[in-house]
Amino acid sequence: MQCIKFLLVAVGCILSFSSYSQQGHASVSGVIKDSDGQPVPGAVVVLKNTHQGTQTSADGAYKLDNLAPGNYILLISSIGYTGDSVALTLRENQQLVYNSALASDHGGLDVVTVTGKTEQEKIKESGFSVNSIDVTRLANTTADLNQVLNRTSGVRVREQGGVGSDFNFSINGLSGKQVRVFVDGIPLDVFGSAMSLNNVPVNLAERIDVYKGVVPVNLGADAMGGAVNMITNQKIKRYLDASYSYGSFNTHRAAFTGQYTHEKTGIVLRSSFFYNYSDNNYMMRNNPDYDVEIRTVENGQFVNKDSRRFHDRYQSGMGQIELGVMNKKWADVLFVGFSSSFYTQQLQTGFRQDNVIGNNTKKGESFTGTLRYRKDNIVKGLNFNAFVSRSRDRYDITDTSFVKYYWDGNSMPSAVTELLNNEKTITDISRPRTFGRVNLSYELNPNHSFNLNYTLDHTRNHNYNRLTADEDDIPGLLQKHVGGLAYQQELLKKRLTNTFFGKFYGLNLEQKHWVSSEGGYVKQKDFVTNYGYGIATRLRILRDLGIRASYEYTYRLQETEELFGNGINVIGNPNLKPESSNNINVGAFYGIKNEKHKLFIEVGGFYRDAKDFIFALADVRSSQMIYENKSNVRITGVEGEIKYNYKTLISFILNATYQRAINTTKFTGPESSVPEATYMKRIPNQPWFFSNAELNIGKDNLLGRNTRIQLNWYSQYIHWFYLNWENFGYVGGKSDVPTQLIHSASLTYSIKKGTYNISLECRNIMDAFAYDNYRLQKPGRSFSVKLRYFIK
């Protein structure tokens, strides 16, 4: 059946290949500056009476390519400047350069009104279901990337505590390892376990693209649930961005990123650093209404009362340097890089907060070397992109105390350790990793293009108890091969876009198994291959109205933690199988804008039919969990988002998501006739309705020339959901996570066109009870201040 589906997609791809002429196409590019010679970012550049348009980058640069030869009128517009227009004649294969200097509009002169599209708008209007977030507008806030993404439709980030805590990331109901995270198309975890969405500051990103369910070939991953791709700033030749923030619970955050380009030689130096520290000593509040009891000991008696967290300190840091060249005949990009990261994390609880921990600490470090290369137009229309890295990620967990702690810090002797082991352990986990990615893209003509991608991910897993062994005698091996081929066509004068693709998944696995006849562990090798395929299409009905649909049959291969465990609270499962899913997205979008107003409305529906669904099964008697396969899980849902901007004064965002994830496994086993007790019941510990609202009000030059003051308000609503299976227990005693409504706000003042910035922020203004993954309590009201310096 799978082969037939794959052949149908391939045949459709071949039949839809129209024989358009391969006429040479032209381009026009340049830089837009003001009368003082400073770049004008965000200027709209379009070709009159066409759909071709863009906005200038942070350094004022723009480019319009894939243009047919002919006569055009180029229109340039930016708020606060007089417009510019020029007649152009483009010849076949011509690469025209047109630079413009815009004069300030002090007298309210008539401005040419044009409507180009930003990079975010272009991505959102593609055939894929994707959210594209402009992170630069949040650079002055103290948010990390998790908090930014948690305000996006279809996305839920469930944290286990404060800064640096473990979290579960979900897109349209699929979560955890089913969602892949990238930075500039490279898996984020290549750079070590200290690199995570919950500790990377917003300053390090320019844009974030969130792909839902159906993932393009060029990312090259087994991302069954979707993917997050963080795009860094690579357009500005020289810049420096440095920030520091201090907040409640003794929280410190520092970040630095910059780039220097030597004009004559083309040598480029890039660097990024960040550091996070927090005591995370927020108050744990007793709430018996929801079976959340904070148990302490007073005079030999158990007493439930509010207590402060006492063993949750977290610190992490990362440094990265890249040196290379750009815009050479033999390389458009060539960089050699090195990065190092570390973290120290005290453990305060297991996955349930009544399991209090007071001695265990997790420490880790990683070192990564990278090489990246890109060359466009090796031959006409053929682009080559390659990345390779070698890294070593290591961490250890100490669990040697036979005690049980309570929330006031008191402890009592116990028969087991804090992580419920029967013996003392210092677990040492080391994972040497080699990662490689090669991408070829070929543009046959402006309407037909191909993309070929291949990734190799080779990871060793060394896991042993330092108190009883010197090394892992039988280390595990996880080697992934993911390949993909895509063909994209644009028809009906680019009103219709179709992308057909196929993917290959190969898994080479080596792990130890206990064999009684051998009297010990032996190495077992397995190699499994699977194939996926899909299509994404977008039809623009009107200039501002379009519909889209996408489908993918995809696989997600097992991860090292799921197979080998993490040494803390995850038990390895060597019998775990890959999971697969049929993913469908449908949606529509409508967007209009002029020089004052901008409105974008988006609605969509999604369907996920997962087989061998990998599910984290928690043991209610302990603090441990194990990943297992559920035969069938079906997820359906709808989502919508509205965005409105009035000039640079006001912007408003409102989104909501409803999803239903149910277990569709009828019987307890493949050969069993015993009914599954949870058949057609909701998957537990997953929110099913949530909504976000954001209001931003800002004014330029209110407190002086080249200044801006801005107020941001955020609200988030999460409807209650079951912690365990909904049909277990009696009606009055079902365990659930309560409904929550959380408000946060920030105030930012910027001077000298954003060179100097100061922000004040308050999260959870109403000090409401906040719960998340497995009903773990999150911080209450908190305050912070951030200083940021940016120059280019």
Predicted segments with their positions:
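Membrane-embedded beta-barrel scaffold of Gram-negative outer-membrane proteins
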Residues: 548-552, 556, 579-636, 657, ...
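Extracytoplasmic beta-strand/coil segments of soluble accessory domains associated
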Residues: 130, 146-187
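Gram-negative outer-membrane beta-barrel transporters
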Residues: 601, 605-609, 628-722
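Short, acidic, small-residue-rich periplasmic hinge/interaction motif at the N-terminus
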Residues: 33-38, 43-48, 77-81, 91, ...
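A beta-strand signature from Gram-negative outer-membrane beta-barrel systems
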Residues: 202-241
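C-terminal beta-signal and adjacent terminal beta-strands/loops
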Residues: 4, 606-612, 713-792
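Face-selective signature of the C-terminal outer-membrane beta-barrel domain
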Residues: 320-343, 362-552, 596-605, 653-655
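Short acidic/polar hinge/loop motifs at secondary-structure boundaries
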Residues: 65-66, 186-213
